[in-house]
Amino acid sequence: MELSVAMYGLLCLLFSQAVPMCVPTDYTLYEERRECDFCVAINTTICMGFCYSRDSNMKELAGPRFLIQRGCTYDQVEYRTVILPGCPLHANPLFTYPVALSCHCGTCNTDSDECAHKASSGDGARCSKPLRHIYPYPGLNSYIHPN
């Protein structure tokens, strides 16, 4: 009995490394420009999940080899551009946003990715103007243009 419990625990420990914990996840961006008439909800995917990290509390003795800081970040990303509806002629109606195609656990590349989490205000308000939805599939409306 004890052996089967130990084997089950070992299998769970080994299997947890094979289960993807960092995956593309559906997310809605809200873009509102002062000069345009509408707030736009854009459905996309972002990288979200948990990655193994370790930070020793004895860095002075152990050195950097015990410091492992990884986050869930883009492996492959595609950028798409939408035309924001209700913008006047003098305003640029184009908005480009990332779509996560695949993700991995690794260090964040600050040259190309946003690596810090921005806290929301918590009031639940996303838009102050009327809302329009932009869909990720080009056939659903005429506002999206793939790059």
Swiss-Prot record:
**Source species, domain of life:** Eukaryota
Q: Name one GO biological process term.
A: G protein-coupled receptor signaling pathway
Q: Which residues are glycosylated?
A: 43
Signal sequence region: 1-20
User: Which is a Gene Ontology cellular component entry for this protein?
Assistant: extracellular space
Cellular compartment(s): Secreted
Positions of disulphide bridges: 22-72, 36-87, 39-127, 47-103, 51-105, 108-115
One Pfam entry name: Cys_knot
Could you give a GO molecular-function term held by this entry?
A: hormone activity
What is the tissue localization of expression for this protein? Pituitary gland. Higher levels seen in immature fishes than the mature fishes.
The answer on whether this UniProt entry bears the keyword Secreted reads yes
Q: Does the keyword Glycoprotein apply?
A: yes
Keywords from the UniProt entry:
Disulfide bond, Glycoprotein, Hormone, Secreted, Signal
Stored InterPro entries: Cystine-knot_cytokine, Glyco_hormone_CN, Gonadotropin_bsu, Gonadotropin_bsu_CS
Give the quaternary structure: Heterodimer of a common alpha chain and a unique beta chain which confers biological specificity to thyrotropin, lutropin, follitropin and gonadotropin.
Q: What task does this protein carry out? A: Indispensable for the control of thyroid structure and metabolism. May play some role in the biological processes of the immature fishes.
Q: Which family does it belong to?
A: Belongs to the glycoprotein hormones subunit beta family.
User: What's this protein's name?
Assistant: Thyrotropin subunit beta
Record organism? Oncorhynchus mykiss (Rainbow trout)
Its gene is tshb
